[in-house]
Curated annotation (Swiss-Prot):
HAMAP family: UPF0756. The chain crosses the membrane at residues 1-21, 52-72, 81-101, 123-143. It is a multi-pass membrane protein. The keyword Membrane applies. This is UPF0756 membrane protein HSM_1471.
Length: 151
């Protein structure tokens, strides 16, 4: 096995370091796995991850979000809570964020080079502004509003 020292490997190492410095385990783990895949016999599975990775990630994320409801840690609201203005606002924000995510998927598919900037910006926001890494899909969706392209 020979290691490949190329710009992609350098980018992944940089993302690993930024993830560690920014205390962003999602970036650190993701970049580490991709670096290991790139540098080993697992490289043949990178096209699979490229094609299905976002969908797999969304499925895992959805399972994570629904698990507290299924386990009983989060109770379903009663009918009176469903008609409260805060619930309507929460639903509206949920719809808006889902729309951002959809725009983000389209933008990342048509302009994947922007992903690096989104990841670095997310890491900087986590590291220096006390932010939470909510995900590049939403960031890409918001970016698409500024640059005006989704596909």
């Amino acid at each position: 096995m020979s290691l490949q020292f190329n710009s992609i490997a350098l980018l992944l190492v940089s993302l690993i370091l930024l993830g560690v410095l920014g205390n962003n385990s999602s970036i650190t783990i993701s970049a580490t796995i991709l670096l290991l895949m790139q540098q080993t016999f697992l490289a043949k599975y990178i096209p699979f991850m490229e094609r299905y990775g976002v969908n797999i990630g969304i499925i895992v994320l959805t399972i994570g979000v629904l698990s507290p409801i299924v386990s009983g840690k989060v109770q379903l609201p009663n009918w009176t809570a469903l008609i409260h203005w805060k619930m309507f606002l929460a639903m509206a924000v949920g719809v808006l964020v889902a729309w951002f995510g959809g725009r983000g998927v389209n933008l990342m598919g048509t302009q994947p080079s922007l992903l690096t900037g989104l990841l670095v910006g997310t890491i900087l926001g986590v590291a220096f502004l006390g932010g939470v890494p909510v995900g590049p899909l939403i960031a890409a969706g918001i970016l698409s509003l500024f640059i005006g392209k989704t596909g």
